[in-house]
Amino acid sequence: MRFKGLDLNLLVVLDALLTERTLTAAASSINLSQPAMSAAVARLRDYFNDELFTTSGRERVLTPRAETLAPAVRSALLQIQCSIISWDPFNPAQSDRRFRIILSDFATLVFFEKVVERVAREAPAVSFELLPIDDDPDELLRRGDVDFLIFPELFMSSAHPRAALFDETLVCVGCSTNKQLPRQLTFERYMSMRHVAVKFGRTLKPSIEEQFFLEHGLKRRVEIVVQAFSMIPPMVSGTARIATMPFRLVQHFKKTFPLRIIELPLPLPTFTEAVQWPALHNSDPASIWLREILLQEASRMTSPGDAKRRPRQP
């Protein structure tokens, strides 16, 4: 079918090409043979009067025209899928759907493992691809390349729907065998001690406490930067270093590392961990099903305050 001289089937080819960046991968993703893919690319180049991509070493680099077309083509195809082509009925017990989710190791360890356990019971063929924090998660959502983001609500954009999951508190942690670690920290002592800090992605996006320091013009002494919360305990253990971490995660790691919580001498805010999904997936039955599970499992979590007040077992 043609629309204003363009074979609309070529939009699918163009989207695959712009996404995969190689002819072989693009052809495979839409089940086309290599000759058919090459012929389709030639027709696209003729229609747009543009090469669309050039070769640089082993990479194919998109032309400026192709870079401009990429988001528009993906958006058009997603809109067709969500508004015109009805979503397939979803039966959890029979589905083999694979969900792609961006989340931190914090969310994985204190929350998502319960979700995985439940899904394994209710939908044994459903699978997950858990991805690290990306430099541009909003773009991945817009393109429909991921199904969900799970991280602090304050870092989420307003372009897509979201729902709050649970609140979390930040605490200061040090090694329990460090005899020089005080029971209470002054602000000056906290800022001058050697810190382990976590930053995310290739661009080293700041964590919540780092964002707080930046907004208030504060600078602490960061000795080690890691890219996951799970890397903090071994960097603190057996040293005089301290770190600032989510309370639930400290409780998790106290089972295997000699950690001690010290009260923070500054008012770091409590944050809300939330889930966000592409706006175009609002009516996707599979997405709705998993969103309900996420919210239900989050509602069963004990609040950090309750955990702090819980009496120790003799």
Curated annotation (Swiss-Prot):
The source's superkingdom equals Bacteria
Q: Which InterPro entries match?
A: LysR-type_TF, LysR_subst-bd, NodD_PBP2, Tscrpt_reg_HTH_LysR, WH-like_DNA-bd_sf, WH_DNA-bd_sf
List each copy of the HTH lysR-type domain by range: 6-63
Note whether Transcription regulation occurs among the keywords. yes
* One Pfam family per UniProt: LysR_substrate
Q: Does the keyword Repressor apply?
A: yes
Question: Which keywords describe this protein according to UniProt?
Answer: Activator, DNA-binding, Nodulation, Repressor, Transcription, Transcription regulation
Molecular-function GO terms, alphabetical: DNA binding; DNA-binding transcription factor activity
Which residue numbers delimit the DNA-binding region?
A: 23-42
Q: Which Gene3D superfamilies match?
A: Periplasmic binding protein-like II (3.40.190.10), Winged helix-like DNA-binding domain superfamily/Winged helix DNA-binding domain (1.10.10.10)
Q: Per its database record, what is this protein's job?
A: NodD regulates the expression of the nodABCFE genes which encode other nodulation proteins. NodD is also a negative regulator of its own expression. Binds flavenoids as inducers.
Q: Please report which protein family the annotation says this sequence is part of.
A: Belongs to the LysR transcriptional regulatory family.
Quote the protein name from its UniProt record: Nodulation protein D 1
Species of provenance: Mesorhizobium japonicum (strain LMG 29417 / CECT 9101 / MAFF 303099) (Mesorhizobium loti (strain MAFF 303099))
